[in-house]
Amino acid sequence: MSEPIRVLVTGAAGQIAYSLLYSIGNGSVFGKDQPIILVLLDITPMMGVLDGVLMELQDCALPLLQDVIATDKEEVAFKDLDVAVLVGSMPRREGMERKDLLKANVKIFKSQGAALEKYAKKSVKVIVVGNPANTNCLTASKSAPSIPKENFSCLTRLDHNRAKSQIALKLGVTADDVKNVIIWGNHSSTQYPDVNHAKVKLQGKEVGVYEALKDDSWLKGEFITTVQQRGAAVIKARKLSSAMSAAKAISDHIRDIWFGTPEGEFVSMGVISDGNSYGVPDDLLYSFPVVIKNKTWKFVEGLPINDFSREKMDLTAKELTEEKETAFEFLSSA
């Protein structure tokens, strides 16, 4: 057996964490021979609920879970971490301006970034899920200057999986038969789901999605809006935000960081834009297609970008730039 790794999940009393923790504990994220010390952080008023989650994890009797620690203290939660999954954030309440939401979250992620800087290993991998995920991730990274920027990523895998599944449903294949969809930009309704480079397996052959579907107007219209607005559609139907699908996407995202991406396949994640070849401004946390090897991601280079894509990519970059500027005003005064 390997040495145990320390994995933190914040917002651990919430419903995404409730769907995620079992996957982490049972070996389907870090592998079946990787023991885990699982650290659960939430705010003080949630500690009663968190105790219940702790009891359930104990009752799962998972062989890989060496220890489970529930806490409301950052100095306990962030100590010696190998992986931090930052799920907890201030949710958007009715009538709340996006600016107010940003302000509340800058405070949280500045504090958690500082705790990573002070207590975690410098090799820690940080995955931000709490919304607005891209800007929260950038805030945390800026607050932890001695941890490499490349170690921070945010979740756009849920959007990626949504795009995959919409194509699969339309073609009557399984989601596994669709690969190399891309989510560009922000995890918001300006994100751009791009299937210009995606492939689908039909009758044993790989075919481009545009060629397979022969329905450009759907691909440039309804497909994009369906993926962009899927989160809102789930909330409308279920009266709660996506949890099972979000937890599955987090598991996919972390597993790919840990074990690498399959040959010939790329995935989407929000990463620092420095040095990209797609004309996205530096110093943004932007979702790109990446390949991963030895726990290190690289941009997929050289994909041709048409005018339709360019416009959509620029639009979401503009939104991220505005978010960043607002967040940084708060950051300097926080």
From Swiss-Prot:
Pfam families linked: Ldh_1_C, Ldh_1_N
Cellular localization per UniProt: Cytoplasm, Cytosol
Catalysed reactions, semicolon-separated: (S)-malate + NAD(+) = oxaloacetate + NADH + H(+); (2R)-2-hydroxy-3-(4-hydroxyphenyl)propanoate + NAD(+) = 3-(4-hydroxyphenyl)pyruvate + NADH + H(+); (S)-2-hydroxyglutarate + NAD(+) = 2-oxoglutarate + NADH + H(+)
Residues bound to NAD(+): G11, A12, A13, G14, Q15, I16, A17, D42, N105, Q112, V129, G130, N131
Residue list for modification Omega-N-methylarginine: R230
In-chain residues carrying the UniProt-annotated modification Phosphoserine: S217, S241, S309, S332, S333
Gene3D superfamilies in the record: Lactate dehydrogenase/glycoside hydrolase, family 4, C-terminal (3.90.110.10), NAD(P)-binding Rossmann-like Domain (3.40.50.720)
Modified sites of kind N6-acetyllysine: K118, K121, K298
Keywords, ordered alphabetically: Acetylation, Cytoplasm, Methylation, NAD, Oxidoreductase, Phosphoprotein, Tricarboxylic acid cycle, Ubl conjugation
InterPro entries, per database record: L-lactate/malate_DH, Lactate/malate_DH_C, Lactate/malate_DH_N, Lactate_DH/Glyco_Ohase_4_C, Malate_DH_AS, Malate_DH_NAD-dep_euk, Malate_DH_type2, NAD(P)-bd_dom_sf
Residues the record lists as N6-succinyllysine modifications: K110, K214, K298, K318
HAMAP family given in the database record: Malate_dehydrog_2
Protein name: Malate dehydrogenase, cytoplasmic
Protein source organism: Rattus norvegicus (Rat)
Chain's gene name: Mdh1
